[in-house]
From Swiss-Prot:
Species whose genome carries this gene: Agrobacterium fabrum (strain C58 / ATCC 33970)
SUPFAM superfamilies: Flavoproteins
Quaternary structure annotation from Swiss-Prot or TrEMBL: Homodimer.
Cofactor(s) the record lists: FMN
Catalytic activity: 2 a quinone + NADH + H(+) = 2 a 1,4-benzosemiquinone + NAD(+); N,N-dimethyl-1,4-phenylenediamine + anthranilate + 2 NAD(+) = 2-(4-dimethylaminophenyl)diazenylbenzoate + 2 NADH + 2 H(+)
Function: Quinone reductase that provides resistance to thiol-specific stress caused by electrophilic quinones.
Keyword Hydrolase: no
Protein name according to UniProt: FMN-dependent NADH:quinone oxidoreductase
Cofactor detail note: Binds 1 FMN per subunit.
Gene name, Swiss-Prot/TrEMBL: azoR
Keywords: Flavoprotein, FMN, NAD, Oxidoreductase
GO molecular function ontology, one term from the record: oxidoreductase activity, acting on NAD(P)H as acceptor
């Protein structure tokens, strides 16, 4: 049995290319075994509140010192952490928005990157606790950011690899769907390449 966590984040909904291919990959992975499970969080349709003073205080306090409001905030964050830790495979879909990830995805990260739960500090440095997971990132972009002159503007993939690695998730595969603003032929080529890559990865899993 494999537990799959699908995180989609594009505010474009059904028109989103990253949502489409992340969903397709997660679906193909789930279909490999009847015992596989799939949990889907759509961060645009059901946004996770950004960190505020209540939530920040809640995750820093022992449970018996929290106010009622802080307990609710901590329980919500704990649920997200539990979903992540239970997953064997994580599929993340995001568009490249102003050279980085969607803010809703950042909010999810801020809730699951928790000291003592998904990482810990030691005398020799931080240690990730969310280990043993395969992560797939589907990144959609209007331009081309996987290579060429604009690669340095792609802050999304380096950031995601850094923060995921910090939590112990180092086996990361990136699927680019890019050049989507370069006309119909470019879109057709990008979509075909993404479809082939999704099929390849699903078969290899």
């Amino acid at each position: 049995m494999s537990n799959i966590l699908l995180i989609t984040s594009s505010p474009r909904g059904d028109e989103s290319v990253s949502n489409k291919f992340a969903g397709e990959l997660a679906g193909k992975l789930k279909a490999k075994s009847a015992s596989n499970t799939l949990v889907h969080r759509d961060l645009a349709a059901d946004p996770i509140p950004h960190l505020d003073t209540v939530k920040t205080a809640a995750i820093r306090k022992p449970a018996d010192q929290r106010t009622a409001e802080e307990s609710v905030a901590a329980d919500y964050s704990d649920k997200l952490v539990t979903e992540l830790l239970a997953a064997d495979t994580v599929v993340i879909g995001t568009g490249l928005i102003n050279f980085n990830i969607y803010s809703g995805l950042k909010s999810w990260i801020d809730n699951v990157a928790r000291a003592g739960q998904t990482f810990k500090y030691t005398e020799t440095g931080p240690v990730g606790l969310a280990t043993g997971k395969k992560v797939y990132i589907v990144l959609a972009a209007a331009g081309v950011y996987s290579e060429g002159p604009a690669v340095s503007m792609n802050h999304a993939v380096p950031y995601l690899k850094t923060v995921l690695g910090f939590m112990g998730m180092t086996d990361v595969e990136v699927i680019y769907v890019e050049g989507l603003a370069f006309g119909p032929e470019a879109v057709e080529k990008a979509v075909a390449a993404a479809e082939a890559k999704v099929e390849e990865l699903a078969q290899a899993a």
